[in-house]
């Protein structure tokens, strides 16, 4: 579904679309919470860039095991608790307490290899993490043999 560059103010409730492969709605006027996408089990790409989103529902991205790209740049998001999501996450230019950060979380299914970031950073279950940004405030240990660097 491609809805970019319109004046949409909402995106409905997409959880009942299990065959949805991509959802692109950047450059609109979408407000409020990102809805629950957990029922979109084939979703691989989501772009809600440059909207007016402030939060997302708990579990909005759970069960999205095929997801590999989310772009949430240029919104008004204030939360980062994406513990179970292993994707390319572009969340900079928001109001997240940890700072404007572009984060790549790559899905690695062979072995655990989890990074030991504190849960308050929202990335405690990430297997691969690449963070780009200034003063992003992450702390914790990296396992001695990471799966990928």
Show the residue positions of the predicted features:
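Hydrophobic anchor residues at the C-terminal helix/turn of individual leucine-rich repeat
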Residues: 14-17, 37-39, 59-63
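Conserved hydrophobic beta-strand positions in leucine-rich repeat
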Residues: 1-3, 21-25, 46-48, 70-72, ...
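Conserved hydrophobic position(s) of the canonical leucine-rich repeat
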Residues: 8, 20, 31, 40-43, ...
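Beta-strand-rich solenoid/repeat architectures in extracellular/passenger domains
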Residues: 16-17, 28-29, 39, 76-79
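Leucine-rich solenoid repeat scaffolds
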Residues: 62-149
């Amino acid at each position: 579904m491609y809805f970019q560059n319109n004046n949409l103010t909402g995106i409905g409730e997409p959880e009942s679309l299990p065959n949805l492969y991509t959802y692109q709605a950047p450059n609109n006027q979408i407000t409020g919470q990102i809805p629950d996408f957990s029922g979109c089990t084939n979703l691989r790409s989501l772009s809600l860039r440059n909207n007016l989103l402030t939060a997302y529902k708990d579990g909005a991205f759970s069960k999205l095991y095929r997801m590999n790209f989310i772009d949430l740049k240029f919104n008004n998001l204030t939360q980062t608790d994406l513990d179970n999501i292993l994707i390319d996450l572009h969340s900079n230019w928001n109001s997240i307490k940890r700072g404007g950060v572009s984060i790549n979380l790559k899905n690695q299914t062979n072995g655990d290899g989890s990074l030991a970031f504190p849960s308050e950073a929202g990335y405690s279950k990430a297997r691969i993490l690449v963070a780009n940004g200034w003063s992003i405030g992450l702390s914790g240990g990296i396992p001695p043999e990471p799966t990928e660097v």
